[in-house]
């Protein structure tokens, strides 16, 4: 059975093209090597596989750069002549092999490409000449005596100014876009310190402090002096470390406060430093220093919350001591009317010279007289205990 003759046309299958290239590549490389040795010629063979892999071959005494330079020195006419000679030789070879190949198809494709490139070159040359003509008009305006020509120049100037204004407006909008984004984030309350941008935002981000509350909810506050004032803290609150750290006591050891006042304190104390209330009272400052007038009110509110939290923990400690040693407190003290209230910001000191035992309770309850949360001090006196003789 004879060998099937392959038609000279493009193979549709990718795998078939790769197999055919691999088989015939070795044959053409062998022929090129034999030709360079037998005829002692400068030869360069460069091929790319269907997958894009390059294969290059050159003679023993040949250099690829030298051969390409020699070919580049040929004139276009000489190149076309050599090309036609090669195609005629291929045509004779195909006729002997009974292959139907149209050589003019190869020539036509090449001629169309050259014609297209020639047309593009002509177009570019015409545009270049037009640009030179316009520039020559602007360099010699004093020599122009035609009114129509001057009108054309004026119209060209007007269009150029319009294009410049459009470009300027577009550039200005691109510059204002980051500022508008930052303003939008500020009004929507989304990460204001980061939205302001610049080095100041990074410093504010590093100065953020976390304030835990009794409900174990972490609340973030900026570390600005207008939010956490330390100016009068030592003189107003003796012990304030508990306001910044969570209590390590378990929940089952926290006793509920007896009486109606203690129940109110328990309800208000659990949510006094909640996330929602802090979000309403300690909002982020507006840009350009517009919250300077609100610093005093914020300081008063923060001090009130700190005092309330501090005194609640003192009450819890006293209640635990009462449970451990009930003999130190008289349960009839409250029934005998020994509890009275002292107005806010006033102090009362009672000295007992008859060896009466008294005990001070600093209980803080809301007061509606001041329009905000204020507190009254309650002193509870207990009569002395009779010692057994």
Curated annotation (Swiss-Prot):
Keyword Coiled coil listed: yes
Tissue: Expressed in pollen.
GO BP, sorted A to Z: pollen development; pollen maturation; positive regulation of transcription by RNA polymerase II; regulation of pollen tube growth
Gene Ontology molecular function: any one: cis-regulatory region sequence-specific DNA binding
Biased composition (Low complexity): 312-324
Protein biosynthesis as UniProt keyword: no
GO cellular component: nucleus
Keywords: Coiled coil, DNA-binding, Nucleus, Transcription, Transcription regulation
Region (Disordered): 310-343
Family matches, as PROSITE patterns: MADS_BOX_2 (PS50066)
Places the protein is found: Nucleus
Sections of the chain in a coiled coil: 77-131, 293-325
Span of domain MADS-box: 1-61
Subunit structure: Forms a heterodimer with AGL104.
Role: Probable transcription factor that forms a heterodimer with the MADS-box protein AGL104 and is involved in the regulation of pollen maturation at the late stages of pollen development and pollen tube growth.
PANTHER family in the cross-refs: SERUM RESPONSE FACTOR HOMOLOG
Name the UniProt record assigns to this protein: Agamous-like MADS-box protein AGL65
Lineage summary: Eukaryota, Viridiplantae, Streptophyta, Embryophyta, Tracheophyta
Gene label: AGL65
């Amino acid at each position: 059975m004879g060998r099937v003759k392959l038609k000279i046309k493009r193979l549709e299958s990718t795998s078939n093209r790769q197999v055919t290239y691999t088989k015939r590549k070795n044959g053409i490389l062998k022929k090129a090597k034999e030709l360079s040795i037998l005829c002692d010629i400068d030869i360069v063979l460069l091929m790319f596989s269907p997958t894009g892999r390059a294969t290059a071959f050159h003679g023993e005494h040949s250099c690829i750069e030298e051969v390409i330079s020699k070919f580049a020195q040929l004139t276009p006419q000489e190149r076309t002549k050599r090309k036609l000679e090669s195609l005629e030789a291929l045509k004779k070879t195909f006729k002997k092999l009974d292959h139907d190949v149209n050589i003019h198809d190869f020539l036509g494709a090449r001629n169309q490409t050259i014609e297209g490139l020639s047309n593009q070159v002509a177009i570019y040359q015409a545009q270049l000449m037009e640009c030179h003509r316009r520039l020559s008009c602007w360099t010699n305006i004093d020599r122009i005596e035609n009114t129509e020509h001057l009108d054309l120049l004026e119209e060209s100037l007007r269009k150029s100014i319009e294009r410049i204004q459009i470009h300027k407006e577009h550039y200005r909008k691109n510059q204002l876009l980051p500022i508008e984004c930052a303003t939008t984030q500020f009004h929507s309350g989304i990460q204001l310190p980061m939205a302001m941008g610049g080095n100041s935002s990074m410093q504010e981000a590093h100065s953020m402090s976390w304030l835990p509350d009794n409900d174990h909810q972490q609340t973030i506050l900026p570390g600005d002096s207008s939010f956490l004032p330390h100016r009068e803290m030592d003189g107003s609150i003796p012990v304030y470390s508990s306001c910044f750290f969570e209590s390590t006591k378990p929940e089952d050891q926290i006793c509920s406060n007896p009486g109606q006042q203690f129940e109110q304190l328990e309800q208000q104390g659990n949510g006094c430093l909640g996330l929602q209330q802090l979000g309403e009272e300690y909002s982020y400052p507006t840009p350009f220093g517009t919250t300077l007038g609100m610093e005093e009110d914020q300081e008063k509110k923060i001090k009130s919350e700190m005092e309330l939290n501090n005194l609640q923990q003192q009450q819890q400690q006293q209640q635990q001591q009462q449970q451990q040693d009930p003999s130190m407190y008289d349960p009839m003290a409250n029934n005998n009317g020994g509890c009275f209230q002292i107005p806010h910001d006033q102090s009362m000191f009672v000295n007992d010279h008859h060896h009466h035992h008294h005990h001070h309770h600093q209980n803080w309850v809301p007061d509606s007289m001041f329009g905000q949360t204020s507190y009254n001090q309650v002193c509870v006196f207990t009569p002395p205990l009779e010692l057994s003789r």
